[in-house]
């Protein structure tokens, strides 16, 4: 049933709060969805209300499992037809239950970015991904888990009386770019999440298998976060095929990958003490004997017959996720999908987060034309 815990700090406009309280205490359309108000400390300053959504999605085995999301509403009353919906696919935070973004303060970068989105009149739905915030551990970069977490969140929020328009656009950054495209890959235009009109992705890891193989090499360079990214990938591969991963880790790698299961990004990066991804495996040139095949099993996307426009952005100075294959991936999408518009925008001199921020004016233009 619906759970309501009104906190005035999380709902700042008195008349709106009373209307929202009436909405949240209305009977639910399904017993599998519950809502309440999130702590204001975990919200965006520009949001008039922050709502916690609990719903059912799929875990890494394809079984029904609980998931959580934050829904952030813009100031003012909804327009006729409801607020247009932006779905936020977040980047890497970790794979442990306690890393769920909806239960942590938002970063300064995200507060600024989504302050503009909310101020422009869009509601923001932000799934945590299954396993974050609901126990069980998140299967990192798992196409099924990420894609279903997003699509099922949209379907779930539609069972509530919150006034949202039918159309929605997904925005993803870094790992979230893969999550956003996972949702596009699994999207059914006749299903309960119908109305997807576009995707905007930045910091995309294109050609995942080869790019990760390069990241593991002893000669690789890049940000300090890369060893944590590598460990999270190895946790996901262990979940799929432990016998294909664990025997090929170094002594340090076994301890560090075990730590990755319970440690969020910043702390896990610090625990590496400057080591590179190569330190995790016995053979940095071949992290595991079936590495690229297993990465493909985990992360592969449908890239043909996609039904919606896609905007891709990248920074030329990105050292977290090298944009080596981004333009090539955009060319592939255009060739494979001649009936949609695929744009690739280059942000000179911008790093991983910088490209995300630099893309905001283009993203707002995309939202105006697709919502």
Which role does the model predict for each range below?
Residues 2-4, 9-12, 27-78:
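Catalytic-loop region of hydrolases
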Residues 68-70, 81-94:
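Short beta-strand element of the alpha/beta-hydrolase
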Residues 90, 95-96, 101-133:
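Conserved alpha/beta-hydrolase
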Residues 140-161:
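Alpha/beta-hydrolase active-site loop
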Residues 155-224:
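Primarily recognizes the serine-hydrolase "nucleophile elbow" in alpha/beta-hydrolase
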Residues 202-303:
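Accessory cap/linker subdomain of secreted extracellular hydrolases
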Residues 283-294, 313, 320, 327-328, ...:
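C-terminal catalytic histidine-bearing segment of alpha/beta-hydrolase fold enzymes
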Residues 306, 311-318:
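Short beta-strand/loop motif that positions the catalytic acidic residue
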């Amino acid at each position: 049933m619906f759970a309501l815990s009104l906190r005035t700090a999380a709902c700042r406009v008195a008349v709106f709060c009373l209307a929202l309280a009436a909405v949240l205490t209305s009977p639910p359309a399904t017993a599998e969805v519950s809502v309440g108000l999130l702590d204001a400390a975990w919200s965006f300053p520009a949001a008039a209300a922050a709502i916690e959504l609990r719903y059912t999605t799929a875990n890494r085995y394809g079984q029904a499992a609980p998931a959580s999301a934050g829904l952030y509403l813009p100031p003012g009353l909804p327009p006729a037809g409801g607020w247009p919906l932006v779905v936020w696919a977040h980047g890497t935070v970790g794979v442990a239950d306690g890393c769920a973004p909806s239960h942590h303060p938002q970063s300064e970068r995200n507060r600024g970015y989504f302050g503009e989105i909310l101020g422009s009149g869009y509601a923001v739905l932000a799934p945590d991904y299954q396993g974050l915030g609901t126990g069980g551990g998140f299967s990192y970069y798992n196409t099924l888990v990420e894609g279903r977490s997003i699509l099922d969140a949209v379907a779930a929020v539609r069972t509530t009386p919150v006034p949202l328009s039918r159309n929605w656009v997904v925005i993803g950054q870094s790992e979230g770019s893969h999550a956003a495209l996972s949702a596009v890959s699994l999207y059914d235009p006749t299903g309960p999440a119908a109305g997807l009109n576009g995707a905007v992705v930045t910091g995309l890891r294109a050609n995942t298998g080869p790019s990760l193989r390069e990241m593991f090499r002893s000669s690789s360079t890049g940000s300090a976060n890369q060893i944590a990214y590598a460990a999270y990938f190895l946790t996901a591969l262990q979940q799929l095929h432990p016998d294909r991963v664990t025997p090929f880790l170094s002594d340090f790698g076994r301890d560090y990958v075990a730590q990755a299961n319970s440690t969020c990004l910043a702390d896990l990066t610090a625990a590496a003490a400057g080591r590179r991804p190569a330190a995790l495996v016995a053979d940095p040139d071949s992290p595991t004997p079936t590495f690229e095949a297993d990465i493909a099993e985990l992360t592969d996307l449908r890239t043909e017959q996609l039904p919606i426009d896609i905007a891709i952005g990248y920074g030329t100075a990105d050292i977290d996720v090298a944009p080596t294959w981004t333009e090539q991936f955009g060319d592939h999408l255009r060739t494979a999908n001649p009936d949609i518009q695929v744009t690739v925008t280059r942000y000179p001199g911008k790093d991983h987060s910088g490209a995300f921020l630099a893309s905001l004016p283009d993203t707002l233009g995309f939202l105006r034309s697709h919502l």
